[in-house]
């Protein structure tokens, strides 16, 4: 009798274990389903339903034993925090997405001329000489004393000299580049460097033997 009783207890305990093992699996399945639903809701942007599902999970957890309830409460709190963080990020995204729509509306109201990039508008064919000429004309309209007028004209003359010098430097630089490309480039008597070098003789200059 004792053996049968012990066996019955063993069977009952085994059945209890099996039920306990089956319950977590069944409990996990709704969580997986909830996560899939949450993903769908995230894609649709429905944050209100997320709060409802969290409340439903809390109600389900209260009906379960205390040991399981405590474990689930920790999980639900973590999930709730992650949902709150995710919801705040998602709420920020629609606002940022709404801005391009307002820009497109504003662009639709603007005339076609304003569609040209700003940098393209700023580019002009006016050179430094043109600007200096305009500045000379504008100086007469300004209320400058004679000394100030002289200073301004001196500054303009300096600018023109610097421009001319920079052009000369660029010309010399280009000349040097051409010499580097062709080491046998003909040089005049003033360009002798490090000894006497005869100018380059082309094929036509060589006498026929």
UniProtKB/Swiss-Prot annotation:
InterPro entries: TF_A-like/BEX. Residues 1-125 are annotated as: Disordered. It is found in: Nucleus. Its main location: nucleus. The keyword Endoplasmic reticulum does not apply. GO terms for cellular component: nucleus. The modification N-acetylmethionine is found at residue 1. It holds the Pfam family BEX. Disulfide bonds: none annotated. Residues 25-96 have a biased composition (Basic and acidic residues). Keywords: Acetylation, Nucleus, Phosphoprotein, Transcription, Transcription regulation. It comes from the Eukaryota. The modification Phosphoserine is found at residues 88, 96. May be involved in transcriptional regulation. Belongs to the TFS-II family. TFA subfamily. This is Transcription elongation factor A protein-like 4. It comes from Pongo abelii (Sumatran orangutan). The gene is TCEAL4.
């Amino acid at each position: 009798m004792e053996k049968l009783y012990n066996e019955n207890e063993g069977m009952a305990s085994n059945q209890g274990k099996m039920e306990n093992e089956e319950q977590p699996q069944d409990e996990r399945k709704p969580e997986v389903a909830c996560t899939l639903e949450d993903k769908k809701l995230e894609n649709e942007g429905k944050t209100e339903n997320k709060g409802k599902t969290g409340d439903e999970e809390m109600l389900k957890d209260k009906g379960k034993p205390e040991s399981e309830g405590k474990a689930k409460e920790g999980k639900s709190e973590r999930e709730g925090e992650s949902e709150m963080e995710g919801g705040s990020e998602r709420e920020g995204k629609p606002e940022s997405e709404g801005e391009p729509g307002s820009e497109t509306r504003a662009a639709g109201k603007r005339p076609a001329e304003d569609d040209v990039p700003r940098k393209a508008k700023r580019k002009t064919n006016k050179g430094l000489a043109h600007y200096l000429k305009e500045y000379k004309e504008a100086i007469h309209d300004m209320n400058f004393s004679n000394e100030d007028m002289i200073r301004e004209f001196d500054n303009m003359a300096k600018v023109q000299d610097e421009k001319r010098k920079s052009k000369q430097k660029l010309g010399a630089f280009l000349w040097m580049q051409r010499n580097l490309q062709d080491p046998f480039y003909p040089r005049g008597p003033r360009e002798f460097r490090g000894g006497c070098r005869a100018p380059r003789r082309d094929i036509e200059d060589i006498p026929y033997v």
